[in-house]
Design a protein with these regions (language model features):
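Noncatalytic alpha-helical scaffold of FAD-dependent oxidoreductases
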Residues: 1-126
Length: 126
């Protein structure tokens, strides 16, 4: 198709390599990406695919592979952005499914070490 970005030609190769190296899951189906076309804003963009990493290595491997294929990457949180940051024509990485641990809370220094999928409500419970 003439209007498709050039990186779409490499998407099948990217998907094949990604599924071989990923411990987590990924979904590049129309139904799977449809859930990530919107956030709390009025913007609508169809992602290239969605990755659900299980580990930090999954994050690193996904980012490295995206760089190799010159694919844009979007790390998505809760999809609550009202300015469109959570939607883009990119490989969306959703950490909210598996990377949700609160690893350490240091009350004295007012810091917390958390996985990237932790939401504020979960942190407040600790």
């Amino acid at each position: 198709m003439p209007n498709e970005p050039i990186y779409h030609a490499h998407l099948k190769d990217f998907y094949a390599q990604l599924t071989r190296m990923l411990q987590g899951e990924c979904d590049f189906s129309a139904a799977g990406v449809a859930l990530y076309t919107t956030d709390a804003s009025n913007y609508r963009q169809v992602p290239l695919g969605v990755v659900y990493p299980h580990t930090v290595d999954d994050l690193v491997n996904t980012a490295t592979l995206c760089k190799t294929f010159s694919l844009p990457v979007l790390l998505r949180g809760g999809g609550t952005s009202q300015n469109g940051q959570g939607v883009n024509e990119a490989v969306v990485v959703d950490c909210s499914r598996y990377l949700t641990r609160v690893l350490d809370i240091d009350v004295e220094n007012q810091t917390a070490l958390v996985d990237p999928g932790v939401i504020c409500d979960a942190l407040k419970q600790h």
